[in-house]
Amino acid sequence: ATGGGPTMYKYHTPSGDKSMDGLSMALRRGLGLRDMEMVQFHPTGLMAGDETKMTGTVLEEGLRGAGGHLINGKNERFMYNYDDAGERATRDIVSRAIYEEMRQGRTSPYGGVYISMAHLGPENVAKKFQGMVKRCADSGFDLAAGLVEVVPTAHYLMGGVVVDVETRTSLAGLYVAGEDAGGAHGSNRLGGNGVANSTVYGGIAGDVMAADAQKMGALHDPDETILDQELARAIIPFSAKPGNVQELRVRLMDAMWDDVGVMRDAAGLKRGIEKIASLKSDMENVGVSGDNLAFNLSWHDWLSLQSLIDTSEVIAKAGLSRENSRGAHFREDFPDAGSLEDSYFTIAKSGDKGIEVNREAVKFTIVKPGESLLGADEAETLVEAAQ
């Protein structure tokens, strides 16, 4: 568990040090990554300009849940044009609606839209959402009484390493939990379940690996060949002339936002794959100084970018492979969910021909589409149960 963090997008919620290192390592060892096209965007990331790292940080869903309004650059409340639930629609629907408003040019000065809470009473908002009010104030916005600019922001990766229910992988001795593991959230994680997932499966992984270690008797010696390969990979940037690593990272973030982002189609995904391939090639000619290896942040940035490029390629190719729209993955050229009975998940692996994506059928072992585990007289929701 290395902490996922889709920071390869122009707007993202995780801190910049999160760089998908765990998934990149899994790829290099030949493990399968599942559902990598499923990138969740939080609809309301703070939009404060490119000059501040505050841009992209989350403004919590409780703001919309409490009755906050989303307003475009023409001062129009627009969410009911997209969904009957308005601002309380699911994350993916609200993110796509905001993205479409941006694409149509109905934007705020920084290029996003606004969230408005003032109609709920400034004093009430300031009391109920103290942390959010302070976060906005730090960037010059008055959440309680004014308008705050927001933008969809890459928040969570539902995909990850293929694991079983006890966190084991196809590589003996490797256990994966948290955001590095795929499958726990399907195609669309519910708010709050990220922490629960890490806590539950982190505990399971600890218990299982302890039990497995006892059965092994003795630990295996490290594979010297793999260690040599990883060392050789790590020192690659010292063989090229020092260059601007950050410039390449900005190119990656722009490519992923523009072509592999909230709304996708085949042309854009192919364009994104080409841009990623170009970045891979350019990385070979951009090095870092090796004069001081201790606390060499440029070296760290180079290795982090390599991991982000590796996983970005998987996301783009998995997105191209999935020709339907499920959860957080939306294809404008394939807007329908397709047959539920024929559901599948994608499996991406790195091989001799590069990244290859295949499909694996979903096995409905407990409940099938259209069926319910509830009895005929049982309420399906807590609201129904209370009536």
Task: Locate the predicted segments by residue.
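Glycine- and aromatic-enriched mobile tails/lids
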Residues: 64, 71-80, 85-87, 98, ...
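Glycine-/small-residue-rich beta->alpha transition segments that form the dinucleotide
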Residues: 2-6, 180-181
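FAD/FMN-dependent oxidoreductases across multiple families
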Residues: 130-174
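Gly/Ser/Thr-rich active-site loops/lids in small-molecule metabolic enzymes
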Residues: 16-30, 195-200
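Alpha-helix capping and helix-loop boundary segments enriched in small/acidic/polar residues
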Residues: 6-17, 54-58, 89, 123, ...
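Beta-strand segments within the central parallel beta-sheet cores of soluble alpha/beta enzyme folds
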Residues: 36-42, 148-149, 219-228
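An anion/pyrophosphate-binding glycine-rich loop and adjacent beta-alpha core
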Residues: 25, 31-142, 146, 208-215, ...
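Glycine-rich nucleotide phosphate-binding loop and flanking beta-alpha elements
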Residues: 6-7, 40, 169
